[in-house]
UniProtKB/Swiss-Prot annotation:
This is Heat-inducible transcription repressor HrcA. InterPro entries: GAF-like_dom_sf, HrcA, HrcA_C, WH-like_DNA-bd_sf, WH_DNA-bd_sf, WHTH_transcript_rep_HrcA_IDD. The keyword Repressor applies. One of its GO terms (biological process) is negative regulation of DNA-templated transcription. Signal peptide: none annotated. It comes from the Bacteria. Pfam families: HrcA. Belongs to the HrcA family.
Length: 356
């Protein structure tokens, strides 16, 4: 969907202005630096003098599409200019067959693993390797079906509650033991839970155990009953951000683009944001607003607005077409959008297929 800004600015740009603007942006995407009028005159299809090109560049600068990073420098696109370029000029082509086959082979191989976590980590790694940016996966902690729960005594006051899902996930929690709990009571609570929770999701298991406990209170002694109720209560009750896993691979790739102290500050902001993982649920909501790939450039990306980074992200869905996560590439604003957009889109489609 085009921004109104795009439609307004297209009215003022003739073919010559568009051609010059496009070459300025493409030069920036290639090497990250400004381009001057002399270099542009050699790149353009039309024969134009440097003076004529400078006049056009002045008009583009007045429109807020380009700027000079310092006096007597060439011109670079502004954030608005990059958005204008992406929406008005960029054509996302098809992935080369070699890259398509590479993504498919690696993602499908990881899909054979029992652990969904391993599968998503590999998807993030594939995106990082191919994009030379950082591959990012946001995954909701979807409810797998339960296979086994066990209490393992640690000391007189604590036990380790171990939950295993049929999808291969394992989670551990420390539970405080009521005074006087015996080994036999731990075993009784474990056996009771495992007799009734297999094949259920966690929320279904909680409802079922609550119902059974009210009906069979006499069948369990007081301490065993307490363990059964607290055993399942340990999981859940988390805020929205904590129900989302953030997987990032390829942070070191971002260091390759560092050219100045300002770049280091930008990266520090980005790494801090990735570590704190605040408001990740908001990003997941943003991906759900569209049907395909979303591109967030610079401050458009509210999560990483201080880092001067761009994010190309797409949702992946379950069999009911519900968004259950998102994946993408984060990097400098001079990402190769035309190449990365189809890469992210295809990977999201593969992940959706394999998780159904």
């Amino acid at each position: 969907m085009k921004h109104k800004l795009i439609d307004d600015e297209l009215k003022y740009l003739d073919e010559r202005s568009r051609d010059i603007f496009r070459h300025i942006v493409e030069a920036y995407l290639n090497d990250g630096g400004p381009v001057g009028s002399r270099n542009l005159s050699r790149l353009l299809r039309q024969t134009l003098s440097p003076a004529t090109i400078r006049n056009v560049m002045s008009d583009l600068e007045h429109l807020g599409l380009i700027y000079a990073p310092h006096v007597s420098a060439g011109r670079m696109p502004t954030q608005s200019g990059l958005r204008f370029f992406v929406d008005a000029f960029m054509e996302a082509g098809d992935l080369p067959n070699e890259e398509r086959e590479n993504i498919e082979a690696q993602v499908k191989e990881a899909g054979h693993a029992q652990s969904v976590e391993h599968f998503l980590v590999q998807a993030s790694q594939v995106l990082s390797d191919l994009s030379r940016g950082a591959g990012l996966v946001l995954a909701t902690k979807h409810e797998g079906t339960l296979k086994h729960i066990e209490f393992v005594r640690l000391d007189g006051e604590h036990a380790l509650a171990v939950l295993v899902t049929q999808q291969g996930g394992v989670e551990n929690r420390i539970v405080h033991l009521p005074e006087g709990v015996t080994h036999a009571q731990l075993t009784e609570a474990t056996n009771f839970l495992n007799a009734h929770i297999q094949g259920l999701t966690l929320s279904e298991a909680k409802e079922e155990i609550a119902r059974l406990c009210s009906e069979t209170r006499a069948a369990l002694d007081h301490l065993s009953h307490h363990l059964v109720e607290t055993g399942l209560a340990l999981w859940g009750g988390e805020g929205a951000d904590h129900k989302i896993r953030l997987i990032v691979r390829g942070r070191s790739n971002l260091l390759e683009d560092v050219k100045a102290e300002e770049d280091l500050k930008r990266l520090r902001h980005l790494f801090d944001d990735l570590e704190t993982r605040e408001s990740m649920a908001q990003l997941l909501d943003l991906t759900d607003e569209g049907s395909g790939v979303r591109i967030f450039i610079g401050s458009e990306n509210k999560l990483f607005s201080l880092s001067g980074s761009s994010l190309v992200v797409a949702p992946y869905r379950d069999s009911q077409q519900k968004v259950i996560g998102a994946l993408g590439v984060i990097g400098p604003t001079r990402l190769n959008y035309a190449r990365i957009v189809p890469m992210v889109d295809y990977t999201a489609q593969l992940v959706s297929q394999l998780l159904r």
